[in-house]
Amino acid sequence: MASPEERLLDELNNVIVSFLCDSGSLEVERCSGAHVFSRGSSQPLCTVKLRHGQIYHLEFVYKFLAFKLKNCNYPSSPVFVISNNGLATTLRCFLHEPSGLRSGQSGPCLGLSTDVDLPKNSIIMLGQDDFIKFKSPLVFPAELDLLKSMVVCRAYITEHRTTMQFLVFQAANAQKASRVMDMISDMSQQLSRSGQVEDTGARVTGGGGPRPGVTHSGCLGDSHVRGRGGWDLDNFSEAETEDEASYAPWRDKDSWSESEAAPWKKELVRHPIRRHRTRETRRMRGSHSRVEHVPPETRETVVGGAWRYSWRATPYLARVLAVTAVALLLMFLRWT
């Protein structure tokens, strides 16, 4: 049975594989072991080989990893390092800042800008505040939130030059941009319910291991998984993939709990929840009023212990009586 540290590493790797890039599969080299959590260690969580012309959602993946680590009470924030060793350009994801990177031991450390030429043996290090500092001169302060603007990286890798272009994507509609978070919250609720069922079954059988006859799906490996609210290359807010084959990595893995997704759900679907409550209130009020004012269905009533037939005029008879009364009134006025 996997330890909690191994399960957390699998969850973080699945987040990177699923949301880092939209098109194509990623070449990911995963690392495992408790030394990944050691402070100052040079062992990354995973290493992703960057390809020419691809767009990578760096800020979204970074915020996702930071959110999960914060819920696990991890003391430090993740660090992304883009490096060029002359043979390949890679993105290394660390759970903390490795020692010696800023001092230049691994090569010159370049800052984040719109176009960054990445020569051989140079690196670009992205920390907790680098995305906000990069977006601040480009967008309004109200648009610094992840749902309104997102920093992405487009890689230009050729034989003679390697350039990283950092862009800010903005969503024309915040509701479309929040569908990814909505999907995450829905998946977490499904997993919480399925986890409770599995725990109940394990207690009944008397053990916590896998039960005979029940198969559990494994990790996603290096395959690319795209969420239903994933972003397009040109406009991440307009992309909507509705095919049933697009799964989230935690659909088959017990990775998210309801408490982890609660802050995101509360922030992102506040207005839809309010509208849902309004509809529920109106429905309850309407049903209550109908119950109060619905006439009796039976045509028999009991008054004072005596039976009395309840006569009610049909709609067409009421119309006939009204027309007759109007005709008699006109005749009376004509004769007078």
Swiss-Prot record:
Taxonomic superkingdom: Viruses
Gene Ontology biological-process annotations: viral budding from nuclear membrane
Gene Ontology CC terms: host cell nuclear inner membrane; host cell perinuclear region of cytoplasm; membrane
Nuclear-side segments: 334-336
Subcellular locations according to the entry: Host nucleus inner membrane; Host cytoplasm, Host perinuclear region
Perinuclear space side: 1-315
Residue segments, region Disordered: 193-221, 277-297
Membrane topology recorded in Swiss-Prot or TrEMBL: Single-pass membrane protein
Keywords attached to this entry: Host cytoplasm, Host membrane, Host nucleus, Late protein, Membrane, Phosphoprotein, Transmembrane, Transmembrane helix
Listed transmembrane segments: 316-333
Effect caused by changing residue 87 to W: No effect on budding ability
Biased composition (Basic residues): 277-288
Entry PTM: Phosphorylated.
Cited function: Plays an essential role in virion nuclear egress, the first step of virion release from infected cell. Within the host nucleus, NEC1 interacts with the newly formed capsid through the vertexes and directs it to the inner nuclear membrane by associating with NEC2. Induces the budding of the capsid at the inner nuclear membrane as well as its envelopment into the perinuclear space.
Protein family: Belongs to the herpesviridae NEC2 protein family.
SUBUNIT field: Forms a heterodimeric viral nuclear egress complex (NEC) with NEC1. Interacts with host IKBKE; this interaction inhibits host IKBKE kinase activity and IRF3 nuclear translocation.
Protein name, as recorded: Nuclear egress protein 2
Species this protein is from: Epstein-Barr virus (strain B95-8)
